[in-house]
Each structure stands twice: as C-alpha cells, then as structure tokens.
C-alpha cells in the first residue's frame, strides 16, 4: 500500500510539473511536447513480467512472452528481458521485484542487484534482431526520468545508439574523465553530465549509486535520466560513458535519455 501511495503521489507531482511547464511555455509563446503520462495501463510491463513471464519460467522453463528470465537469486533479485513493441531492435530489462522507477529509494538499497551489466549483456538480442554483430560503441542503455516514462515499473532500454551521439562521444572521448563533468556540447538538444567507466566498472559501480553519491546532492534521482553507452578510449581500451541529465519541465526537458538511442538501429546499415 505504501508503494502504491508513493506512485500515486509521484503521478500527481508529474502532472503538476507538466501543467506548470505548459503554462509557462504558452505564456512565453513557446511550444513543448510533454510525454504521455496518461498511458492506458501504466502497469502493463509489470503485469507481463509478473503474471506471465515469471510463472512460465518457473513452471515450464519457458520465459514467453519474454525473451529471457533470470531467477538465480529468486524473484527479488531476478530480471526479465522483453522485446519492446516499439522499434526493430529495442529490448527492455525489467526487474522481477516491484520497483516503480527512478524515484524509488530501493535503487540505493545495499541489497539491490546491479541490473546494468545484465542489461549490457542483453545486447546480443539487439544484435540478433539487427542480423549482425555490432561494435561495442554502437550499443546504449537508458532509463528515463519519472517525468518522461509511461510505465510504473523500472525498465532499462537496450538498443543501438543514435549515429550523431556515437560520433560526438567518440570525438570528445579524451575530455571525459572519471568524475562527473558537464559536457561542453549538447546531445540531441540537451546537456548532460558525463563520466568514464572502464569495462569492469559497470559491474563494480552501479550507475544509480554513482549518480546519487556524486551528482545528485539530495540522493533524489526522480528527475534524473541515466544513459550508459559503450565507448572506446585511449589505446583501444573499451569502457562506458555514463551520462546523467536532470529534467527541467519548465524548459520543456522531461529527462528522456532514451532519445540518445535509435530504435531503427541505423548504425547496423551504415557499417
């Protein structure tokens, strides 16, 4: 009941933020596009995973309609991989425990699994849909802020990276250090903070905790969007660029880091 009440409270706050942003934009003669926060069923992902994928996996070792279900540590530590209905190559990692999204304090709990390495490993499903191997820096992971999502179950988007985003990060890879620094350029029309993680760092340093401890003073991640993109650093070192951006609805920015991903996977056709 407490979790449901918290979700309802956040939905009310989201609507209020968006209403205020829209009023300011109208007063300024601007036009902004708000996310669809009135999605028909905001529990659709949770229902699919909890009521279908997990029972099928437990009873028949068949994760359908999900692509995969991992329950080695039990449902509180498990996750499912589901092909998203949008896009040719997009998949989602969805925890099998109830976690609403970026506003959940569970994200910082010491017993929460680090879902990001498993999401990265799921790039093989993206490659299968693309019908080719994809370079390390062609893949990205994203979680949208509480203001930009349509579902009230945490999910990590897994897909190809937008070609211009890949090119920009490659051109500035030497400027991205191991602490949070604001990028001096925009990605898809918005500014991000970035930091360098080595290949093992994604498992050793949970991005949720990295953002909460080093970037968000209050530890409140609700309006943050997080993106992880594969990167090639100096001397061929593989790693990741961790990106974080705070939603600012009064400026028409709802924290939709998923914009950095390309659900048509144009990179697969380019190389």
Predicted regions and their residues:
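N-terminal secretory signal peptides that target proteins for export/translocation
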Residues: 1-16
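Intrinsic structural disorder/low-complexity segments
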Residues: 7-10, 23, 158-160
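Intrinsic disorder/low-structure terminal segments
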Residues: 13-15, 23, 38
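Bacterial N-terminal signal peptides
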Residues: 20-33
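HIT superfamily nucleotide-processing domains
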Residues: 38-271
């Amino acid at each position: 009941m407490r979790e449901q009440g918290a979700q309802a409270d956040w939905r009310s706050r989201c609507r209020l933020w968006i209403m205020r942003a829209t009023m300011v934009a109208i007063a300024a003669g601007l036009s902004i596009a708000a996310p669809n926060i009135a999605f028909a069923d905001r529990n659709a992902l949770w229902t699919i995973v909890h009521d279908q994928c997990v029972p099928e996996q437990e009873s028949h070792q068949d994760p359908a309609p999900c692509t995969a279900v991992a329950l080695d540590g039990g449902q509180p530590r498990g996750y499912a991989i589901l092909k998203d209905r949008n896009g040719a190559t997009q998949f989602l990692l969805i925890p099998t425990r109830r976690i609403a999204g970026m506003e959940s304090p569970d994200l910082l709990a010491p017993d929460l699994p680090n879902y990001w390495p498993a999401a990265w490993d799921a790039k093989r499903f993206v490659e299968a849909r693309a019908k080719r191997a994809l370079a390390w820096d062609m893949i990205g992971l994203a979680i949208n802020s509480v203001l930009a999502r349509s579902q009230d179950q945490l999910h990590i988007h897994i897909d190809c990276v937008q070609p211009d985003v890949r090119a920009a990060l490659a051109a500035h890879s030497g400027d991205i250090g191991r602490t949070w620094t604001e990028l001096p350029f925009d990605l898809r029309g918005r500014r991000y903070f970035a930091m360098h993680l080595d290949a093992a760092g994604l498992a050793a340093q949970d991005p949720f905790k990295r953002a909460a401890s080093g970037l968000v003073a209050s530890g409140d991640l609700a309006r943050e969007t997080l993106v992880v993109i594969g990167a090639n650093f100096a001397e061929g070192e593989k790693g990741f660029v961790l990106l974080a951006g705070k939603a600012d609805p009064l400026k028409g920015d709802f924290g939709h880091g998923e914009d950095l991903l390309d659900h048509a996977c144009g990179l697969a056709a380019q190389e």
